[in-house]
Amino acid sequence: MEIKLINIGFGNIVSANRIIAIVSPESAPIKRIITEARDRGMLIDATYGRRTRAVIITDSDHVILSAVQPETVAHRLVSKEAPAQAEESAD
């Protein structure tokens, strides 16, 4: 399995293979997830003091805050996967 990395803003990089969800931080359930992750010590704040625009949830139960829009992170994730899929179909 190939390791794919994705930039989540300000030079912060996350393993794309570990991402389960990329969501907006506006809803009450997501705010609750952020609070619970902070209490458990599983919160990673990659916003550099800026407003949180995306919440990334990983398969290891880490919650990552990013200052980049969820759509932007998702677009970067999809554009990383597209070349790999093209290589696989060529084989």
Swiss-Prot record:
It comes from the Bacteria. InterPro entries: RemA-like. Disulfide bonds: none annotated. It holds the Pfam family RemA-like. PANTHER family: REGULATORY PROTEIN SSL2874-RELATED (PTHR38449:SF1), REGULATORY PROTEIN TM_1690-RELATED (PTHR38449). Belongs to the RemA family. This is Putative regulatory protein PTH_1796. It comes from Pelotomaculum thermopropionicum (strain DSM 13744 / JCM 10971 / SI).
